[in-house]
Amino acid sequence: ANTKGDGEKSGEDFWVKAEKLYYTALIGYIWYEAPDEEKNFTTLLEMINASEAREDDEDFQNPVDLMFERLEEKDPEHFAVKQYKKYKLAAGKTAKSILISCGARLAPFDIKELRELMETDEMELDTIGDRKTALFVIISDTDDTFNFVVSILYTQLFNLLCDKADDVYGGRLPVHVRCLLDEFANIGQIPKFEKLIATIRSREISASIILQSQSQLKAIYKDNADTIVGNCDTTLFLGGKEKTTLKEISEILGKETIDSFNTSETRGRELSHGLNYQKLGKELMTQDEIAVMDGGKCILQLRGVRPFFSDKFDITKHPKYKYLSDADPKNAFDM
């Protein structure tokens, strides 16, 4: 149960951990005790809604308390029971605050359509590496209200595929899974992505991170942004004006050696001439040169080789371009 959202302050750490403890207890109960048809997010929400804590009555028991009491009688060493007893160490006022925090964080799931989305597994994410599959995740580029759902999806996808690669296929999926993460900055933070990007490749999984600028990545992943970039074997720059990106691309390109000749002439009683020769280092492309790069050009950096300055691919020359709606409006896919 990962409950830590963006912008959590160190002073709020107690409440985040308390929420996580409570979620862990409830999810443990659902996982081990609930029937298969109730092992879903909706059951978790219903259990939270059935929870209640009273400041003036420490002995009050809500329906969830009674459920765990019966479970403890049956199995005192049950994982969920141990987690719940830790949560119950909180006094009535503290427990009430924890429940309010849970309710506030999960408020979006009060929307009926979102609950229904979480009730059943219709996507079978764990089968994507078994056969050729195309999964389109379409999100709004102006409203980020539900971007956290996409973040949950990607987290689940990577975890399921890595587990299946290890447990079923001996470490590598039979069909390569390529994740084209367009507008990566808009899907929210994927927990531990800086570690995933380094380990998924061995499972036959790759990720293409598409950003408007490097600063977008740093805004979301902070110090881990450099780790993420460092684990990408290929960098493709299509153009841009953001200063941080221009600086990093210029540094990646390195320097070239130029020959410098300086001549001097001194006039006096006698005329003398001087010639000075030296080798100097100059950026292969300066930041201002990259900023005004022709729109039809791109820079490609592959690990282990020098960068390429190349023409962008003309998509109209692709053999399957005729199937796109750009080529023929009749091909437009209406959802």
Where are these regions (language model features)?
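P-loop NTPase motor domains
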Residues: 1-205, 220, 230, 279-283, ...
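Conserved ATP-driven motor cores of ASCE-family P-loop NTPases powering translocation/secretion/packaging/pilus
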Residues: 197-299
